[in-house]
Amino acid sequence: MILNGEEQNAIKYENEMNRDLINNIKYNFNDWDEYLKYGGFPILARKINFRRLSTNIVDMIEKVVNTDMVAIKNFTFENQTNSNRILRYLALQNAGDLSQNILAKYLKTSQANVKNILDILEKTHLIFSIEAYGTSSKRMKKTKKYYFATSSIRNALSENSGNTINDIKQYEGILLENHVASILFNFTQRGNDCFTLYYDANKKRNVDFILQQDFKNPVPIEVGRGRKDKKQITHAINSYGADYGIIISDTTTNIEKHNNIIYVPPKTFSFL
């Protein structure tokens, strides 16, 4: 569906999935919301204390920084501290609000050192980055967007650092964007016919992601908690010559296709 715009097979799969969940008497319909905040780590699956779950995730992150990253040549104790501060900084910002210059001033270090730390953090698979959609020169000029490997990592660090967002829907929307980014990025890393994930760098009516296969028309993807109108996705379809676009939100309770826009509920997208 994502790759070809054909929704029928996905609808069939969605119906089977919903039927299986309804017939599972042990299934808790809050599970998906809990997964968005605390999932992604099978080793922690049986823990039911959410505060303990977040603490365990933070402990794993610190182990990666303080043990695995230390094994890298010339990685100093100061940069261990900087790495932890960068991760917490990222957890409290929108994905596109990272300026290496501002971050360097915040850490009182050089931009080159910030870039080096971010590169190493990517190698640990705690975070990943995507570039702006466009020409090679545009991608070089625009800053990268950074996301966490799972939305639960972002949530754990945010809770641990003191989340400053009071609007729960806004916060869940940020987690959902990270979750979708993670799924799409992992898809592109499996050697699936040269797919690349980008973000939309347009300043007006930009969508969240653009997925492209080689030289084929791109697929714009918009993500949001709650209901989303079609203005942004329609603008992206027209701007980039896309055949169709995808909105991942609570606008519909099931997969629906209206003209050249496919609506997908967040839970369904997670299972596809």
Where are these regions (language model features)?
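A cross-kingdom feature that marks ATP-driven nucleic-acid transaction machinery
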Residues: 126, 130-272
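Interdomain hinge/linker elements that couple catalytic modules in large macromolecular machines
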Residues: 2-156, 162, 168-175, 182
